[in-house]
């Protein structure tokens, strides 16, 4: 799946983001999807991310596929707005996701700052 049209502005692939997200979902069980619901929503996300980016694939064609998968999620019990909101939220998070390496570096910096503050008595 590693294609430019599945990457965000930081060059991070949607696949890496989905793996990262699934690790958090397993920890917190925030989303309680069936396999079919997850399939439909993740595919809607995929087409939303790549819409207008894949060579020789019109934006409208990918958005048509997005709608097909949203409709599938609705058939599986989601309200349309609920499915669309989930996809929009995941897309907005993905667009700013800098990858696991950047996330771990940010956590290291925060820990270091906290330790420095403790040493200085803050």
Q: Each PLM stretch: what is its role?
A:
Residues 1-122:
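Intrinsically disordered, low-complexity regulatory regions
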């Amino acid at each position: 799946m590693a294609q430019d049209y599945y990457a965000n502005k930081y060059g991070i692939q949607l696949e890496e983001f989905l793996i990262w997200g699934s690790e958090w979902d397993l920890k917190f069980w925030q989303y309680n999807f069936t396999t079919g619901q997850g399939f439909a929503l993740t595919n809607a996300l995929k087409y939303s991310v790549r819409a207008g980016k894949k060579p020789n694939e019109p934006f409208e064609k990918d958005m048509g596929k997005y709608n097909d998968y949203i409709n599938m999620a609705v058939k599986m019990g989601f309200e349309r707005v609920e499915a669309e909101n989930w996809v929009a939220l995941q897309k907005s998070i993905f667009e700013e996701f800098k990858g696991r390496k950047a996330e771990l570096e940010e956590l290291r910096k925060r820990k270091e700052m906290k330790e420095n503050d403790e040493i200085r008595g803050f």
